[in-house]
Amino acid sequence: MPSSTPSTNGIMPEAKKAAKAPPYEPNITEPNTRAELIKYWINLSLDDRTAQKMLWLSEGGAKVSRMSEEVCPVLDRPERYEHSPQVLCKQGLLGNRGYWEVDCEGWVVIGAACESAGRKAKDGPCGLGENDLSWGVGWAGCCYHVWHNGENTEFQAPLCPIIGIYADQPAGIIKFYLVEEGENGSKEVKLVHRFTANLKEMLFPGFWVGRNSYCWIRKMDQ
């Protein structure tokens, strides 16, 4: 993934709320179509306490931008990313499934991180997908790259402005999709990659944002 200054397994000072989703039913068929995925849609908002200082949040916590190197006048906090230009959402997944979609423009990585994934320089790599507690996907100029634990896999597809993410925290499943226009104005999904992991803690949607770029969390009716 785009290189960032390292991250630690820091412990969060406050308990987080799990995102609202349908009651968890184990052993169901894994959703694969967009119609199946949106049954697990969760509403998300960005957590300004985690946002690295070059990131600016707007649209009621739905949009994160980095349009210059201007630093946002915010206080230092234990949960704030120190160097990696990232932000997490307030809502996390624990004991449930969730699906969300993001509009993106520019040099971004969209993914998820476990609650204890590091955020400070002393912690080692903390960019999404740079460590064993986070996963990410991003456009690499000619194809998509998915990252985990510092390793990347290529996926050949044209650039798509909407990314979909599905996570089943108890089952340890994280899937990335391209959300494309289908017939009759409907939307369809194309699987980019499916990760399996042993997820023992809360999983938070997250965003890495490069220069002149933004991510905007979509609403279900968009």
Show the residue positions of the predicted features:
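Beta-rich ligand-recognition domains in immune and ubiquitin systems
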Residues: 1-222
